[in-house]
């Protein structure tokens, strides 16, 4: 099957000239064909993610964020066996290890459910004559997650729920060796009610990574190499 990008809540097929085979390492069988993003496509995705963030998630109340996070957590718990099967088929680890990986990611999603209530600023009264000081916490905007081959579900789940809980839009670039688990998890976010464009998945190689690293509208990057 064709493994596409997920952009603005919709599967998005890239150029036919930019693809890569995906294999089951246990059998050597080709299991899919992965679309690879060009630098131009990455730029378009970041721009659209920023627009979605400005129009929706940046303005979302803490209650709205929490509702999406709790619903995502429930969906992830219900579907973790399905996601584990995708990991096993493309990564090669045994199913029990794959389920353990998703469970570790689920723990972070559970933690993130409480973050909106922890995003408190500070206030200090009369720090100087007739001067009060206060601080507030604000989202950054578009952030990127570049995840490795060895934990295709757990590593993105370390970062994405926290970034979304804090009000950011996210662009994920999974490993091109085992991309399907990230697509499956991203679909759960949409089902949980996250606005389109707040979570995007772009598949690719060095060209896509370089485009994310150098884009001026990407305000933070989470990277784990392997």
Regions found by a protein language model. Give the residues of each.
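Terminal low-complexity tails and localization/encapsulation signals of metabolic enzymes
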Residues: 1-33, 67, 71, 121-146
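Histidine- and aromatic-rich ligand-binding microenvironments
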Residues: 5-6, 21, 30, 34-44, ...
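Residue-level signal for inorganic ion chemistry
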Residues: 28, 65, 87, 109, ...
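Rossmann-like NAD(P) dinucleotide-binding subdomain of oxidoreductase/dehydrogenase enzymes
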Residues: 121-226
